[in-house]
Amino acid sequence: MVSLTSYAFVSMMLFSIGAIGVIARKNIFVIYMSIEMMLNGINLFLITFARYHFNIDPQIITVMVISIAAAEAAIFLSVIILLFRSKKSLNTDVFTSLTQGEN
């Protein structure tokens, strides 16, 4: 059986890689994928905690996080499509103005 620290280390690494991706990348889609990686790291830790401490509450929270992430994915991807149609780029440097009149 794999130890609790091994799962905690993997979940910490997933979260850290996702956080670095959010901070360092300029592509909106890559930032979105990094956010999803961070959520998966959190979910892995919650499931590990539930398994080793025989508690069902973290599993319920994980199911809620997964369902919220699915709704977030639908909204975020539609926003990405609209931004790409308007600016023809997914680079965050292009999106400096919030007004519609400016290109």
Curated annotation (Swiss-Prot):
One GO term of the biological process aspect: ATP synthesis coupled electron transport
EC category name: translocase
Catalytic activity: a quinone + NADH + 5 H(+)(in) = a quinol + NAD(+) + 4 H(+)(out)
Its membrane topology: Multi-pass membrane protein
Pfam families documented for this protein: Oxidored_q2
Keyword NAD among UniProt keywords: yes
Entry-linked InterPro entries: NADH_UbQ_OxRdtase_chain4L/K, NUOK/Mnh_C1-like
Subcellular location: Cell inner membrane
Domain of life per record: Bacteria
Keyword Thylakoid: no
Parts of the chain that traverse the membrane: 4-24, 28-48, 64-84
EC annotation from Swiss-Prot or TrEMBL: 7.1.1.-
Molecular-function GO terms, alphabetical: NADH:ubiquinone reductase (non-electrogenic) activity; quinone binding
GO CC, alphabetical: NADH dehydrogenase complex; plasma membrane
Keywords: Cell inner membrane, Cell membrane, Membrane, NAD, Quinone, Translocase, Transmembrane, Transmembrane helix, Transport, Ubiquinone
Entry function: NDH-1 shuttles electrons from NADH, via FMN and iron-sulfur (Fe-S) centers, to quinones in the respiratory chain. The immediate electron acceptor for the enzyme in this species is believed to be ubiquinone. Couples the redox reaction to proton translocation (for every two electrons transferred, four hydrogen ions are translocated across the cytoplasmic membrane), and thus conserves the redox energy in a proton gradient.
Family as reported in the entry's similarity comment: Belongs to the complex I subunit 4L family.
Subunit annotation: NDH-1 is composed of 14 different subunits. Subunits NuoA, H, J, K, L, M, N constitute the membrane sector of the complex.
UniProt-recorded name of the protein: NADH-quinone oxidoreductase subunit K
Species per Swiss-Prot/TrEMBL record: Aliarcobacter butzleri (strain RM4018) (Arcobacter butzleri)
